């Protein structure tokens, strides 16, 4: 039961006592034996009777008050099906290869990871990116401002600083050239200020890259060989379905787990440039110097073999018998305690009896109702409800209830003798358990129990986040109205609409997210035309130029650039066929242009 229901109960109990007292005074001959007053009920049997009535009427009144939120929640479930689903705990792990490994091992996305600590229950996570476990690692990282010792690269004359990464094989007998990898994925680890400044330098100030061996440049690359990670559907972390708008998911990930965007790929590598040596260097040249960052960078800030993980596992729910007397059935994972299990999404619903099986029933709001005689017209409906009590513990969570209905949304009511059994498979999380596991001092303990490869060590690089739940009940009215009206940024209210979108998706409302929202001071959109080069052919394309005004007094420059990178990808999701969007950010303090991102449509850069 929630605190909200307690208010209803107390209100009904006070009403019964007050009205009972008035009734007793008005009709003393009839109601004298009730012995009621507003402060006390003398007869304990009457007191219990009133408390029972107050409980029942409180339930009825709460159901009536919640009737409209249930409607808006159902509509949100139809148009934005994942909005009210809990967002499980997320983190970043690093996998170190064995010292005897001679080649790269790829851990696929979706690999099971367990995270635990002594005295805590085990939590199941899944990897979100394909992860390269390499036979080498970053041994040293340092940033040098000009003048610096060079490697005779052509770009050095224009460089004002250089980031030097030293790669070293796990064994002196293994050369870097043995690796056939054409891509390396790095993770920017450490304090957010360091990671964001390094991110800004790589994607705003980088003018060239060189593979260096013994102080000499062996191969040079351009900034186009750098690719930001986390902006395509294959690199999602929050488990939203394809029915949900990917731009919304991207903003939610940015607001609640920005670490997923701190990965970058170095493409089109040829490690044979390092020859037979077990060591080599990669230098990144920048057109800006940074005295503060020069003192902060270490090898811990740039890591290989990392991936985001999310607290998610597939489980079978306890089978339930479909009965005419029941209108919905609460889902409980088999062999899991209620305080450490919570349903995130339903994967499959099956109905069966002694001679029929209805497998993979569709959800009622999927919009795929069938009239074929060979298929059953039976559907399932999911309802979520916040509860603060699970398994005898005060443990906040969101319970899931399933109803079985026909195409008229009437309950499926079979005869009791037919013995229908409902089985459900769902994706679940460990409720709030993952965020409670201690972090630091060698904890938590991380392993991959289903992976056959031997790894020397797996460690957690960031504290697992708390499980996040969007507000429901009365809040759903405002949410529904905003979800329908906010994705319009071309009018004078564009900046306000953008702030409202971020506020709607900032479920926790932390001071950091509030500052981010307040930093957006203005927005302007104009029609533009750009030249497009595709497959060697040149053409012209119409698009929308978006200019955002951001306050430098509220956000630092590296925070502004990181926000702009995400918003550029977000706006590009709105580009129609044969159009593009291009984001420019200006600073309110000076009015100067801070940065202009490439024109893009969806996940593809055009100009």
Language-model features: locations:
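Residues at beta-strand starts and edge strands
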Residues: 87-91, 159-163, 180-182, 205, ...
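Mixed-charge (acidic/basic) macromolecular-recognition segments
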Residues: 1-30, 34, 223-229, 233-273, ...
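Extended assembly-interface regions of large multimeric machines
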Residues: 1-216, 223
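Short, Φ-rich (hydrophobic/aromatic) sequence segments
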Residues: 45, 49-53, 75, 202, ...
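Short, low-complexity Pro/Thr/Gly
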Residues: 172-382
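Extracellular ectodomain segments of secreted/surface proteins
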Residues: 56-64, 82, 149-181, 309-352, ...
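C-terminal domain/tail detector
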Residues: 355-607
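Short linear motifs embedded in intrinsically disordered, proline/glycine-rich low-complexity segments
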Residues: 1, 55-63, 74-83, 88-103, ...
């Amino acid at each position: 039961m929630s605190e909200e229901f307690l208010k209803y109960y107390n209100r009904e109990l006070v009403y019964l006592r007050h009205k009972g007292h008035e009734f007793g005074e008005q009709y003393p001959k009839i109601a004298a034996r009730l012995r009621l007053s507003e402060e006390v009920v003398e007869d304990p049997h009457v007191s219990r009777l009133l408390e029972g009535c107050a409980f029942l009427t409180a339930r009825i009144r709460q159901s009536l008050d919640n009737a409209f939120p249930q409607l808006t929640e159902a509509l949100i479930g139809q148009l934005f099906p994942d909005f009210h689903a809990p967002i499980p705990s997320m983190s970043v792990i690093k996998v170190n290869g064995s010292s005897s490994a001679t080649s790269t091992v790829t851990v696929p996305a979706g690999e099971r990871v367990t995270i635990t600590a002594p005295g805590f229950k085990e939590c199941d996570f899944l990897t979100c990116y394909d992860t390269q476990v390499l036979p080498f690692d970053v041994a040293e990282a340092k940033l040098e401002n000009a003048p610096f010792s060079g490697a005779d690269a052509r770009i050095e004359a224009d460089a004002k600083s250089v980031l030097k990464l030293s790669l070293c094989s796990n064994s002196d007998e293994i050369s870097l050239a043995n690796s056939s990898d054409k891509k390396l994925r790095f993770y920017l680890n450490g304090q957010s200020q360091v990671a964001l400044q390094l991110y800004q330098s790589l994607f705003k100030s980088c003018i060239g890259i060189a593979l260096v061996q013994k102080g000499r440049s062996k191969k040079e690359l351009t900034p186009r060989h750098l690719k930001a990670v986390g902006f395509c559907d294959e690199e999602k972390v929050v488990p939203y379905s394809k029915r949900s708008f990917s731009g919304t998911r991207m903003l939610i990930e940015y607001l609640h787990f920005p670490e997923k965007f701190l990965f970058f790929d170095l493409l089109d590598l040829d490690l044979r440039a390092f020859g037979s040596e077990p060591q080599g260097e990669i230098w990144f040249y920048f057109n800006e110097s940074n005295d503060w960052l020069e003192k902060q960078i270490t090898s811990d800030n740039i890591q290989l073999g990392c991936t985001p993980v999310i607290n998610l596992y597939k489980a079978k729910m306890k089978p339930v018998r479909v009965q005419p007397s029941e209108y919905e059935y609460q889902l409980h994972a088999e062999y899991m305690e209620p305080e450490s299990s919570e349903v995130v999404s339903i994967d499959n619903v099956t109905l069966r009896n002694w001679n029929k099986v209805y497998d993979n029933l569709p959800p009622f709001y999927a919009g795929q109702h069938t009239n074929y005689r060979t298929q059953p017209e039976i559907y399932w409906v999911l309802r979520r409800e916040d509860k603060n009590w699970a398994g005898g513990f005060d443990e906040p969570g969101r319970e899931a209830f399933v109803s079985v209905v026909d195409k008229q949304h009437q309950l499926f009511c079979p005869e009791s003798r037919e013995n229908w059994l409902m089985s459900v498979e769902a994706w679940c999380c460990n409720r709030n358990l993952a965020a409670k596991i201690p972090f630091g001092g060698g904890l938590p303990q991380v392993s991959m129990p289903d992976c056959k490869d031997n790894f020397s060590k797996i460690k957690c690089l960031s504290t697992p986040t708390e499980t996040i739940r969007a507000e429901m009940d009365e809040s759903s009215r405002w949410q529904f109205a905003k979800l329908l009206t906010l994705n319009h940024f071309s009018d004078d209210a564009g900046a306000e609409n953008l702030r409202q979108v971020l506020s709607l998706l900032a479920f926790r409302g932390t001071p950091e997210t509030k500052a981010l929202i307040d930093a957006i001071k203005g927005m302007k959109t104009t029609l533009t035309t750009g030249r497009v080069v595709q497959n060697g052919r040149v053409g012209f394309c119409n698009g929308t130029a978006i200019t955002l005004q951001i306050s430098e007094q509220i956000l630092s420059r590296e925070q502004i650039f990181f926000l702009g990178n995400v918003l550029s990808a977000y706006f590009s999701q709105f580009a129609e066929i044969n159009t593009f969007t291009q984001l420019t950010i200006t600073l309110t303090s000076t009015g100067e242009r801070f940065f202009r991102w490439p024109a893009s449509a969806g996940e593809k850069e055009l100009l």
